[in-house]
């Protein structure tokens, strides 16, 4: 009703979202939809460095100055009790579409959509932020007798949000990902088309291409400069202008990679190997890549990890967890030391004053040590089946492909084959020789294979040495060959 009222009265609406992939795809989707019915639509993405995550007073002040009467918050807002009260005093209403865990106190807004609310009866709880926004659009269309065909066009954005935000690819998310990928392969929107062209790959595109190819580029805009650039490219209708935006994003992504490598190297040298957790900080680290660095550190030191950047006595960090350990709960037990925090079981963001950081490091280590199990501290490969390497062929892959799209809770099957060997052409690849390319010998020839981050194993498999290998199977088309 509040959206209908705003459209009928031609009130100004602000679409407000987070600066990550889920947030920017949500904003692009809602902006494009509402623009059809009300020309008084703007969007706002907070600056990662000046405002931080979520609803900011600066954003609300901007809304007030531009005479906004309704803010639709996407992928954020569920914990913004004070900020939404602040907006209410200014005569601005809020609709919240979020999927993060709520605190005990829910903001007083015109509407709060979040399937993780304890009293929410919606049957599927694992929607992405973009997914929650899509359900709002869907409900609006049902109420106003607008055909579902009118909103199918947004499934491409929805598929990218599902893949990038690491939500389970089950239930509705699986449907969104499947049909969204179908749309991406048939007729992607111009903004996605130019980003996909930058991958240098040919169709068909998979959810992995979106997660590891498109998503980092969208994220790079908010990490290095401002996420507005990501929304600009996603909503752009002009191909040539979209190409210009995509080129800028590509440059930012390259810069992000450089910072990622540099900071990871510095962080590894600072790690205390005798702890159950890792918490590191530096005023020289770029705020935009600390989450990536935290993930990288877990690859080498498998334990709950938080990496902070520092500016003006305030530390802003990203937390990443290991299998089945709830890092959000662990951080919650240290919340009295924090300025703010939010997130999921496996990833979270937090802000703390520098004067409290060493107290936090000690408390977090204590919490982790008391709650983490031995099993959670050991990286594992969950294997679905042992098979003979000779069974891997196109027919076998066609069967596997029927289970796609793959992702959390619907992972690509992992197989193990024993006593295999390379055909003699194995080599280390990548600028730093950190990856491994090999051809595993079979009765019918060989299977091209890549081991990312496995360059160190080259000596163990060269010269025909036999080895056991765990792997998943993907299709790669190059120069007409599959």
Question: Residue ranges of each PLM-predicted region?
Answer:
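A residue-level signal for conserved active-site and pocket-lining positions in enzyme catalytic cores
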Residues: 72, 219, 400, 471
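Intrinsically disordered, low-complexity regulatory tails of plant transcription factors
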Residues: 80-81, 165
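Accessory interdomain/linker segments of ATP-dependent helicases and helicase-like nucleic-acid enzymes
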Residues: 387-447
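Flexible glycine-rich surface loops and low-complexity tracts that mediate binding to linear polymers
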Residues: 465-479
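Hydrophobic helix-and-loop "lid/oligomerization" segment in the mid-to-C-terminal part
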Residues: 1-70, 90-91, 141-362, 370, ...
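Beta-strand/loop nucleic-acid-binding surfaces
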Residues: 444-462
């Amino acid at each position: 009703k509040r959206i209908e009222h705003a459209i009928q009265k031609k009130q100004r609406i602000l679409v407000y979202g987070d600066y990550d992939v889920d947030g920017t795809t949500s904003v692009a989707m809602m902006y494009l939809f509402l623009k059809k019915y009300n020309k008084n639509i703007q969007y706002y993405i907070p600056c990662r460095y000046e405002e931080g995550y979520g609803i900011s007073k600066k954003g609300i002040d901007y809304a007030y100055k531009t005479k906004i009467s309704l803010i639709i918050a996407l992928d954020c807002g569920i914990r913004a009790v004070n900020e939404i009260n602040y907006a209410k005093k200014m005569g601005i209403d809020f609709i919240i579409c979020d999927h993060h865990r709520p605190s005990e106190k829910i903001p007083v807004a015109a509407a709060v959509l979040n399937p993780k609310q304890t009293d929410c009866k919606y049957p599927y709880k694992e929607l992405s932020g973009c997914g929650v926004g899509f359900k709002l659009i869907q409900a609006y269309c049902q109420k106003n007798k607008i055909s579902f065909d009118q909103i199918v066009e947004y499934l491409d954005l929805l598929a990218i949000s599902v893949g990038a935000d690491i939500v389970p690819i089950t239930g509705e998310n699986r449907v969104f990902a499947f049909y969204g990928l179908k749309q991406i392969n048939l007729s992607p929107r111009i903004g996605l088309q130019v980003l996909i062209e930058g991958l240098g790959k040919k169709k068909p595109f998979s959810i992995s291409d979106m997660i590891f190819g498109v998503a980092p580029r969208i994220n790079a805009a908010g990490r290095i400069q401002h996420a507005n650039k990501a929304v600009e490219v996603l909503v752009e209708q002009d191909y040539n202008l979209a190409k210009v935006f995509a080129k800028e994003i590509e440059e930012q992504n390259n810069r992000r990679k450089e910072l990622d490598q540099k900071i990871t190297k510095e962080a590894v040298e600072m790690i205390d190997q005798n702890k159950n957790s890792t918490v590191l900080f530096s005023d020289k680290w770029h705020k935009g890549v600390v989450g990536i660095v935290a993930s990288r550190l877990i690859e080498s030191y498998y334990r709950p990890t938080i990496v902070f950047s520092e500016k003006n006595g305030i530390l802003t960090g990203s937390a990443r967890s290991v299998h089945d350990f709830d890092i959000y709960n662990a951080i919650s037990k240290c919340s009295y030391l924090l300025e703010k925090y939010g997130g999921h079981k496996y990833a979270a963001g937090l802000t703390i004053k520098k004067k409290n950081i060493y107290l936090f490091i000690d408390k977090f280590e204590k919490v982790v040590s008391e709650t983490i199990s031995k099993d959670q501290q050991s990286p594992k490969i969950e294997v679905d089946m042992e098979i003979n390497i000779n069974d891997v062929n196109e027919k076998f892959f066609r069967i596997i492909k029927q289970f796609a799209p793959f992702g959390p809770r619907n992972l690509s099957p992992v197989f193990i084959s024993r006593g295999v060997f390379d055909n003699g052409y194995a080599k280390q690849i990548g600028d730093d020789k950190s990856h491994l390319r090999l051809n595993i010998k079979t009765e019918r020839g060989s299977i091209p294979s890549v081991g990312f981050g496995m360059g160190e194993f080259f000596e163990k498999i060269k010269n025909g040495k036999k080895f056991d290998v765990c792997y998943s199977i993907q299709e790669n088309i190059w120069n007409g060959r599959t």
